[in-house]
Amino acid sequence: MRRNRNIYTLLLLGAIGTFFGHGMWAIDAKETFVALFTGTFDNVFGVVVSTDTAADWVQAIGWFDIAITAVLTVMLIGNLQAKGALYEFAYSRVAMVIFAWAALWGFLTAASRVTAVGDFYPEVWDLVERAPNFMLPAALLYLAYQHRLDHSQGQLTAKDVLHKTSH
């Protein structure tokens, strides 16, 4: 159990760093992020978005990333305490929804490296390089789910559940 908690801590630190760093760049309306936004809307949806409008949206998204970072930090504190309400929150259904959102958002932003340009190759390597942006929260989602299964009624483990459903 402690080993999973340590892994959870490391993954939370990685996700916090990812979302905080990207959030700060977005709040600053980083030129690359604005170009990814306008390029994706043009190539995928056929909608031309002005640079000013894109910069406003990118900044708003940056603040949302910072909010996610704050929630992830609360989860980290709870996980480190290993007891109490914050600990329960770190593995709650709400936490799982946040991890699912973060994984989806991480994938979409990584994929924007491909969609903004419109060519799959060689831009696909930019997506591959950014796999941790979505895989860190996906791993957290898995561990939170595993934790909930392990602590459900009767102390069932994920292996027990899978074994029961396979027969």
Where are each of the predicted segments found?
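Membrane-interface extramembranous regions
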Residues: M1-H167
